From Swiss-Prot:
It is found in: Nucleus. Residues 125-140 have a biased composition (Polar residues). This is Protein downstream neighbor of Son. InterPro entries: Donson. One of its GO terms (cellular component) is replication fork. It comes from Mus musculus (Mouse). Disruption phenotype: Early embryonic lethality. Heterozygous mice show no overt phenotype. Residues 1-140 are annotated as: Disordered. One of its GO terms (biological process) is DNA replication. Keywords: Developmental protein, Nucleus. Component of the replisome complex composed of at least MCM2, MCM7, PCNA and TICRR; interaction at least with PCNA occurs during DNA replication. Replisome component that maintains genome stability by protecting stalled or damaged replication forks. After the induction of replication stress, required for the stabilization of stalled replication forks, the efficient activation of the intra-S-phase and G/2M cell-cycle checkpoints and the maintenance of genome stability. Residues 34-53 have a biased composition (Low complexity).
Length: 560
């Protein structure tokens, strides 16, 4: 017969004695613990150093008032509660221009997603998330007197503000509108006085403004937004595209597009067109005539690119360079000459294949584990793949290779999307002058005024909003017009199409360009002489573009 043991229950369903004993142990243990525990030495040192620590765990028990030593939480050392006062004190450190957009670090910039949306339709939250700042972008203002640095990026929006009204830009008369179009087609040079007393009564100013808004586009469909093309699938999703499922119509569109593209290149080659853009759903190409950007030959920049596109260009015999990678590599060598060991490592990688053949000769290739050919190739191409779709992937083509690039783009099957909202739609051609098959388009301009709070009450603030594909010549023309109409005082916010910001990268030139001769050769390209002089300068902005411009007393300052 089994002997019953006090506190033991064979069924383990109702162990009353066990529970009673545990409660008794807890009371006895709590009585032996002092009411206040001394703080550990590391905690005292941290408090002396001024670290914000949580209160030291006090004694407490599970059984009502019984006291037990609470186990320490290793993750609760620092006070991670939000501190409003600290965040408020850090806000002024961003400077007076800090509210225009957040400055992102280099990692966020490298993970840049180029999905462009119309800036005037964005909310404040969307705008702060979409504005991306390149690595060379700074929050300091630079001044170069009376001229801006050349900016080859395409702007999607210009927002000018001034203490003087922009009413002169509204409701142009029929005669002024017609005269402005004629001035554009005939490339009439307009010279305005330094200051216009009554801009609304100045016919020359209003005609010049109409002239500056004109640009040329192919193809043109009034119901379809054709710029920007990168990341525009969402905008085009609800639009009608009759060519998406009609191969005959797609072939006709591509045939007309090839004729227009060839016409533009011929105008560029004969220096009758200064530059033009090819905007596809994957990348953008900038063709520049000889004499612009400090180059004595025709240049073409492509951004962003992928390893597949670069490999296809190599297979077609197109010689190109990666200017940003060359610039970064040169800076690294200047800072650290020991980087030559990396080149030696690359040479050793090439010798690996020879070592494998030597193993086969001595007959031990099966006994030694070696990487396969695919692994070796992937390791060599790792760095090249990592820069795909990034600003560092920008490609520069110069001289006669630009003609090869022309033929490559015309025959490239991946130039046109095969599915999605842009299926079957040829790339967009943008040019400052007319070309075969082009359609004349106008930038949209709208002026308004708001009340802003000042020390003495409220004052009027006037704004001029220009939207559309604003090319470099249009930005310079607008700055010259506003210099006269706003009496040398205005500010501007510039919104760039991010894939084109990298077009401001500097070029490695074989010889110095005679800018005077270049301007004479391009005298018939359709641009104002002052605009042509600015575009002939070498780019200095690098991967960034102009973000803000301010003119005060006819002195320009800018921020990139």
């Amino acid at each position: 017969m089994a002997v019953s043991v006090p506190g033991y229950s064979p069924s383990f369903k109702r162990p009353p004695e066990t529970v009673r004993l545990r409660r008794k142990r807890s009371r006895d243990h709590g009585a032996a613990v002092p009411a206040s525990l001394p703080e550990p030495a590391p905690r005292r040192a941290a408090l002396a150093a001024g670290l914000p620590l949580r209160p030291f765990p006090t004694a407490g028990g599970r059984g009502g008032a019984a006291a037990t030593i609470a186990r320490r939480n290793p993750f609760a050392r620092l006070d991670n509660r939000p501190r409003v006062s600290d965040e408020a004190s850090e806000e002024p450190l961003r400077g007076p221009q800090g509210a225009s957009g957040p400055l992102l670090d280099s990692n966020e910039e490298n993970n840049l997603l180029w999905e462009d949306t119309s800036s005037h339709e964005r909310t404040g939250t969307e705008l702060s998330q979409s504005q991306r700042v390149s690595l060379s972008e700074s929050d300091t203002w630079s001044s170069d007197g009376t001229e801006l640095p050349v900016d080859w990026s395409i702007k999607t929006r210009l927002l000018f503000t001034s203490s003087q009204p922009f009413s002169w830009a509204d409701h142009l008369k029929a005669q002024e509108e017609a005269q402005g179009l004629v001035q554009h087609c005939r490339a009439t040079e307009v010279t305005l006085p330094q200051s216009i007393q009554d801009p609304k009564l100045s016919t020359a100013l209003r005609c010049a403004f109409q002239q500056a808004l004109v640009y040329w586009l192919h193809p043109a469909f009034s119901w379809l937004p054709l710029f920007p093309r990168i990341g525009a699938d969402r905008k085009m999703a609800a639009k009608t595209s009759p060519w998406s499922a009609d191969e005959t119509l797609q072939h006709a569109l591509m045939s007309d597009w090839s004729v227009s593209f060839t016409s533009l290149y011929n105008l560029l080659k004969t220096k009758l067109c200064p530059y033009f853009y090819v905007c596809s759903y994957q990348f953008t190409v900038l063709f520049r005539a000889a004499g612009l950007a400090g180059s004595s030959v025709i240049t073409a920049l492509i951004s962003p690119t992928t390893r597949g596109l670069r490999e296809a260009m190599r297979n077609e015999g197109i010689e190109f360079s990666l200017p940003l990678l060359e610039e970064i590599g040169h800076k690294k060598k200047v800072r650290d000459p020991s980087l030559e060991s990396e080149e030696e490592q690359a040479v050793s990688d090439e010798d690996e294949e020879e070592s494998f053949s030597w193993l086969e000769e001595i007959g031990v290739q099966d006994q030694i584990k070696k990487p396969d050919v695919i692994s070796i190739k992937l390791r060599k191409e790792k760095h090249e793949v990592q820069m795909d779709h990034r600003p560092e992937s920008v490609v520069l083509v110069k001289g006669l290779n630009t003609f090869k690039l022309l033929n490559f783009l015309i025959n490239c099957k991946s130039l046109v999307a095969t599915s999605g909202a842009q299926a079957g739609l040829p790339p967009t051609l943008l040019s400052p002058i007319a070309f075969r098959g082009a359609s004349m388009q106008m930038l949209k301009a709208r002026s308004s005024n708001v009340k802003t709070q000042a020390l003495s009450g409220y004052r009027d603030k006037f704004s001029l909003d220009i939207t559309g594909p604003v090319m470099p010549h249009a930005l310079h023309s607008m700055s010259m017009l506003l210099r006269s109409s706003q009496r040398g005082s205005f500010s501007a916010g510039l919104y760039a199409h991010e894939p084109t910001a990298v077009f401001n990268v500097g070029l490695s030139l074989d010889k110095e360009l005679d800018r005077k001769v270049a301007r004479e050769d391009l005298a018939n390209c359709g641009l104002h002489p002052k605009t042509l002089e600015q575009l002939s300068q070498r780019p200095v902005l690098g991967k960034s573009s102009l973000r803000s411009v301010e003119m005060s007393d006819y002195i320009l300052s800018w921020r990139s």
